[in-house]
Amino acid sequence: MAEVRAKLAPGIPIDVWCQDEMRVGQKNKLTYRWARKGSRPLAVHDQRTQSTYLFGAVCPELGTGAALVLPACNSEAMQLHLDEIATKVSPGAHAILLLDQAGWHGAKILKVPSNITLMPLPPRTPELNGQENIWQFMRQNWLSNRIFKSFDDIVDHCCYAWNTLIDQPWKIMSIARRDWTTMGHSM
């Protein structure tokens, strides 16, 4: 983060964002449920395969985020998401975007907006990315153990889940915050 700070004009605030994407579809994952001890709770499970991708990013310090529901997970979709994130960065601030090393995150065709710097996380370290915990929370609360009727139903549920989360900034702050990500504000 110090390298990014050195390249910016003095006094420009840095917002640290976490980015990731998840597949949501008819053949969805099962999650834990509350049930009486000794019982075996039932959960529906669909064998159809329609799905979509939810690209999401949050700024845990500010409790805000940016997301898109897209039909594919590739560099074109990543470009759309970067452009969306750029519109949500605080005015006059610069964003450091933490992300994993998926191929489309570092594609040469990406045109990274001027108010964003990409910062790849080390390989196989999902615990460093607060967005992973956001996905877990969304699955447990809104997106799992259900049958989606159609592709549009999947998209509607993704939008509902994200919009419900965004309306609760304290949840984003609580779930995705890492102590070391606040360094950008104090430098």
Please name every model-derived segment.
Residues 1-83, 177-187:
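Extended, low-complexity cationic-aromatic segments
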Residues 12-16, 131-187:
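C-terminal anion-handling pockets and recognition modules
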Residues 17-19, 95-99, 119-122, 174:
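Short beta-strand segments
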Residues 20, 56-57, 63, 82, ...:
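Mobile genetic element proteins and their domesticated derivatives, centered on retroelements
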Residues 39-48, 114-133, 147:
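RNase H-like polynucleotidyl transferase catalytic core
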Residues 77-96:
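Short, basic/hydrophobic alpha-helical segments
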Residues 92-105, 129:
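Acidic/histidine-rich, metal-coordinating catalytic segments
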Residues 107-115:
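Short, aromatic/basic amphipathic alpha-helical patches
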